[in-house]
């Protein structure tokens, strides 16, 4: 069992990488999972969990269910089983479940503990660590949420055996995101090696990158912004396609390519660096056909991104390999020229 400690000002916790251990709790626990994950992994968790009382809440699977209705169901279950300030919630699932449970636990009784048990690659390397929580609204993705760190995170690679290839590749997109912005050595490892031969090491390295970033910038005031590479465009893509055509990681892969187009046009990437990232995405089948329906509407959606300030869009753009820059005040014409390539 490998451990990564994340020491923060208000709350420190550990990320455990290895077989899920027995979890003994002296309080009530509400497990929240989705309809697919519950059928695959709930019994595995229940065999390893001992608590004063356990209840299970199952939410429909999919990004479009990351909404107020699902949040209300989670909270109603918490009230019905009379969770108190010493009780906790357990998120068993991917990024959607992690985000919703984190948010629900942050507002229930003004904040109770929760444990993350991520079952997708995307959630293991990104969503389950760092304390960003939230739900989607008709206006955009993750526009309502909070920073609420988990009590602990348990990453068990056995969960990944049931993942469809598409879900797995979506998680790889988030690994590439972190590598391009923070760690050129990880980029080289992904380029040179078969991921099957070094998966545990890559997951550990990715979580460690995320942990180091969160330790330096828990509330996303500066360096943590790099974790949003591809997300300004990606969230607009998800909204335009009603969260149904692409998985989150797939939309982010497209968003990274759009960001690369913008970075290339601004001279932040050389053509060689641009092609290197393209080739890495292609290696993991993360090149998708996407056509913007209405360029002006898509452009306007970019302003709904949480990073936008004073009617200015902020983009996280790669600056070479292993670094990034927050770029703002980019002329509208420059952005539209990039979007035209995708129209």
Curated annotation (Swiss-Prot):
Cofactor note as given: Binds 1 divalent metal cation per subunit. Can use either Co(2+) or Zn(2+).
Subcellular localization(s) per the UniProt record: Cytoplasm
Binding residue positions for NAD(+): 61-66, 95-99, 119-120, 132, 141, 159-162
GO MF annotations, alphabetized: 3-dehydroquinate synthase activity; metal ion binding; nucleotide binding
Pathway: Metabolic intermediate biosynthesis; chorismate biosynthesis; chorismate from D-erythrose 4-phosphate and phosphoenolpyruvate: step 2/7
GO cellular component term of the entry, any: cytoplasm
Gene Ontology biological process terms from the UniProt entry: amino acid biosynthetic process; aromatic amino acid family biosynthetic process; chorismate biosynthetic process
Coiled coil, from the record: none
Protein EC: 4.2.3.4
InterPro entries: Dehydroquinate_synthase (IPR050071), DHQ_synth_AroB (IPR016037), DHQ_synth_fam (IPR030963), DHQS/DOIS_N (IPR030960), DHQS_C (IPR056179)
UniProt-listed Gene3D superfamilies: 3.40.50.1970, Dehydroquinate synthase-like - alpha domain
Keyword Glycosyltransferase: no
Binding residue positions for Zn(2+): 174, 231, 248
Catalytic reaction list: 7-phospho-2-dehydro-3-deoxy-D-arabino-heptonate = 3-dehydroquinate + phosphate
Cofactors that this protein relies on: Co(2+); Zn(2+); NAD(+)
CDD domains assigned to the protein according to its UniProt record, in alphabetical order: DHQS (cd08195)
Domain of life per record: Bacteria
Keyword entries, A-Z: Amino-acid biosynthesis, Aromatic amino acid biosynthesis, Cobalt, Cytoplasm, Lyase, Metal-binding, NAD, Nucleotide-binding, Zinc
Chief place where the protein resides: cytoplasm
Family: Belongs to the sugar phosphate cyclases superfamily. Dehydroquinate synthase family.
HAMAP family for this protein: DHQ_synthase (MF_00110)
PANTHER family: 3-DEHYDROQUINATE SYNTHASE (PTHR43622), 3-DEHYDROQUINATE SYNTHASE, CHLOROPLASTIC (PTHR43622:SF7)
Cited function: Catalyzes the conversion of 3-deoxy-D-arabino-heptulosonate 7-phosphate (DAHP) to dehydroquinate (DHQ).
Protein known as: 3-dehydroquinate synthase
